[in-house]
Design a protein with these regions (language model features):
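Conserved NTP-binding catalytic cores of kinases and kinase-like/nucleotidyltransferase enzymes
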Residues: 1-87, 213-215, 329-333
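Active-site acidic catalytic loop and adjacent metal/ATP-binding pocket
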Residues: 33-44, 48, 82, 185-231, ...
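ATP-binding pocket architecture of kinase catalytic cores
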Residues: 42-144
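A glycine-centered beta->alpha junction motif in the catalytic cores
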Residues: 54, 88, 105-119, 159-167, ...
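All-alpha amphipathic helical-bundle segments outside canonical DNA-binding/catalytic cores
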Residues: 125, 270-282
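Active-site catalytic-loop/activation-segment of kinase and kinase-like phosphoryl-transfer enzymes
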Residues: 149-190
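Active-site activation/catalytic loop segments of kinase-like enzymes and analogous catalytic loops
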Residues: 230-268, 284-300
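ATP/Mg2+ or Mg2+-diphosphate-binding catalytic cores
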Residues: 288-333
Length: 333
């Protein structure tokens, strides 16, 4: 998180926001990379409080996020339900000079982060369920209409991370911005259709869902934007997994991808030709993550080890960047 934003978040603002959702006790900080995320209790129930600075998302953008999230939940997507404040609103606004924070609250996702070392959790059945949920979201988003909102969610290429890449990167990493520009131009040549482009979560990975008894509950829709479906799939791939340092990683990756796509195809069809550019999409996601790390001051935070991993992959490459995803998919048919 940028230091100037941290300095704006007064302790009494956190207390006031939690009070709007009938908090009892102290709100405990869980995360402070893009938003300030807290856990609190209300009526003996675990809840999540999120405080977002207006420089990250406006209140209308957050309302658009919640509108889509509620639509997905109403149509069967397992996700953390937004909670109305005691004043009957999904968002509460707190001015801080010329800017403001927006508070939102959610039900706590049941379960825990998935244990990728436990074969009882990280297995073919889970991979298929994971893909099925993603396919269902892509199918549902084709029918979602946001025309009733004051402001829609942004398109992915409008993200400040991409618009100001060179401003965030240190001089020795400016090459990243040039490569991102080339990849953006490649996607810019594609013609968006309802079957390939729409409003997507944008950050479905093991840090943004909980599991319990094999069932997933998604959360953190903060990055949702209008984007290519293939980019949404790329984020779900285990790019930063430890498996690639072990023997037999290719067989495990193939199992993951084939089962994931089998589940995906149960709910939505994506033309196989998109799988040919999945390596480029994964490369792009890695570079975007690197820029985002600098934008959120991650190199100087407790998440520095993640930044170092992303930088290493950006500099040295990754097996994903040459993997034959289409071939793996077609061999599973």
């Amino acid at each position: 998180m940028e230091e100037r934003i941290v300095s704006l978040l007064r302790p009494e603002l956190i207390t006031e926001a939690a009070h709007h959702w009938n908090a009892t006790g102290k709100a405990v900080l869980l995360d402070d990379v893009s938003n300030f995320v807290y856990e609190f209790s209300s009526q003996d129930m675990r809840r999540i409080l999120r405080l977002t600075h207006s420089s990250h998302h406006t209140e209308d953008e957050i309302i658009a996020e919640l509108d889509w999230l509620i639509y997905l939940i109403q149509n069967g997507i397992p996700a953390s339900q937004p909670i109305l404040s005691q004043d009957g609103r999904y968002t509460e606004r707190y001015p801080t000079g010329e800017s403001y924070f927006v508070a939102t609250a959610f039900e706590y996702a049941p379960g825990h982060f998935i244990d990728k070392t436990d074969p009882r959790e990280w297995n073919s059945q889970f991979f298929r369920t994971f893909g099925r949920i993603m396919g269902r979201m892509h199918s549902l988003t084709k029918h979602y209409n946001a025309d009733h909102l004051r402001q829609k969610r942004p398109h992915w290429y409008e993200d400040v991370i991409l618009q100001r890449a060179e401003d965030y990167l240190p001089a020795e990493q400016r090459w990243v911005a040039a490569e991102v520009e080339k990849l953006l131009a490649q996607f810019g040549q594609k013609m968006p259709t309802v079957d390939s482009y729409g409003l997507v979560h944008g950050d479905v990975n093991p840090t943004n869902f909980h599991v319990r008894d094999g069932q997933l509950t998604l959360f953190d829709f903060d990055d949702c934007s209008y984007n290519w479906f293939i980019n949404d799939i790329a984020v779900a791939m285990p790019l930063y997994s430890d498996m690639f340092a072990e023997e037999g990683w290719e067989a495990r990756l193939t199992e993951f991808f084939q089962q994931y796509m089998r589940g995906y195809e149960e709910e939505n069809h994506l033309d196989e030709s998109w799988l040919e550019i999945l390596p480029d999409s994964l490369r792009l996601q890695c570079l975007i993550n690197l820029i985002a790390c600098h934008a959120s001051n991650v190199p100087n935070s407790r998440y520095r080890s993640f930044y170092e991993l992303v930088l290493k992959i950006a500099q040295q490459g990754h097996p994903f960047f040459t993997y034959n995803f289409r071939g793996a998919y077609e061999s599973a048919l």
